[in-house]
Structure formats: C-alpha cells, structure tokens
Amino acid sequence: MSGIFGALRLPASVLFGSGQRAAIGMMTAQIGKRALVCTDARMGQDVQFKAIVADIAANGVEVKVYDRTEADLPMAGITACVQEYANYKPDVVLGIGGGSCMDMAKCVAVLLQHGGSLRDYYGENKIPGPVAPVIAVPTTSGTGSEVTPVAVIADTERGTKVGISSPYLIPRVAVCDPELTLTCPPGLTAVSGADALTHAIESYTAARREVTADLAVKNVFVGKNALSDMFGLLALKNI
C-alpha cells in the first residue's frame, strides 16, 4: 500500500487545562459507582489529591485508595493491591500520580478483569479483551502513560523491567491539569521533562514499517507515520 498513513490510539476523553481536576469526580460517576484510586505515599498526603478523592465521593461514588505504589512498579506491589481489593470489584480504576501510579492502575485493571499473573501478559497484544475502565491523572509532565497502550513494571525476580502493550490498556479518560505538577519536586520535574523530550525524539525518528491493511490491527506499535510525525515535531518545538 502507498500514500499517506497515520494511526492514533487515544482515550475516549482527554481533558487538559488548569482546574480540570474538578471534572474527575463527575467523569468517575459517569462510569460507575465503585472506584479504586492508585497513588503513592507522597501523593496520598497531598491536599489536592485528598480534595479529588473527596469530590469523587461527593459525586455518589464509593471510593477506596491504595497509596503504596512504589517507584518503577515492582510486581509484588501490584499483586498486593489486587489481592486487597479483589472482593471490592471496582467499576473504575484511577491512577493519580507519576507513570508508576498510572501503570499500577492499568495493571490492576487487567488482573481484576482477567486474572492470572502479569507474566501472562508480557509483550504485545497478550491481553484477551477489555479491562476495567481506567482514568489516568498525571502529576508529572513526562511519562505520557495517561494516553498510551503500555504499562512498564519491574520483575524483580528476573532483575529487569518489562512492558505490557495492548490497546486495551489505553485509559478511558485522561485528565491533565498542569496545576497538579506544581508540587512536583524540582529534580523530578527536570527528569520528567527529559523523559518527555525523549518520547518526542523517539516518535519522530522511529523506523517506518511496511503499511498493510492489518498493520494497526495486529500490532500495537505501527512505526513512524504522518500523525506521529506531526505530534512528535510539535512536541519537540514546544519542549
């Protein structure tokens, strides 16, 4: 096949702007009546985070918080969260924080829906079907996990980080409120910016793949294309 090819896989809703965190409670209530929020210990004590959780509850949603997400997302932490809330059966899982918190929400959504071990899903397109809806709320500016079909975890037994990739991992909703990044430590802000720059460079310089009708059906990663070029170059200019 020849000609222009482009592919985008995105959440059903992406909200961006200062103060948009005020929509999280309403968006959650549109999806279900029981919510599980995944975050880390620092964010769990944040005033803005507590206000978000209170707003979810004020919208008539029962909400539980798991605030023990660790950096780089060791598999044991994911397993612990799933075991703790399996009987709760949340209708929606929220990841609020950095990339590890959002990836925690994605992995928990997979295991609550399909069971098994995370190792069953290593690689590309191993998730057999839809997972519990995820709402992703980044509090750093670099990961991009709020709009991607990827989760990265640390398999400590194997001593490596592993990716799980599937369109089913794309969050239902992404809420990007720049005000949530203002309390991010300066060092983490710098690293997050470098991370965002790296993602943009990788997008723009990726190798092209042969374009076929089933390229985006059989593959999560479709290579360099017209749309990735457009957004990658825009990101490079803005960063």
Stretches with model-predicted labels:
Residues I52, V82, C101-H114, V147-T148:
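Short Gly/Thr/Asp-enriched flexible loops that form oxyanion-binding sites at enzyme active sites
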Residues A12, Q113-T212, V220:
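A glycine/threonine-rich phosphate-anchoring loop and its flanking beta-alpha core
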Residues R209-I239:
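Active-site segments that bind and position negatively charged phosphate/pyrophosphate groups
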Residues G19, A23, V47, A51, ...:
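Conserved active-site and cofactor/substrate-binding residues in soluble primary-metabolism enzymes
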Residues P90-D103:
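Glycine-rich phosphate-binding loop
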Residues T28, G32, I56, G60, ...:
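Structural signal for hydrophobic packing residues in well-ordered secondary-structure cores
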Residues M1-V92:
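ATP/NTP phosphate-donor binding region
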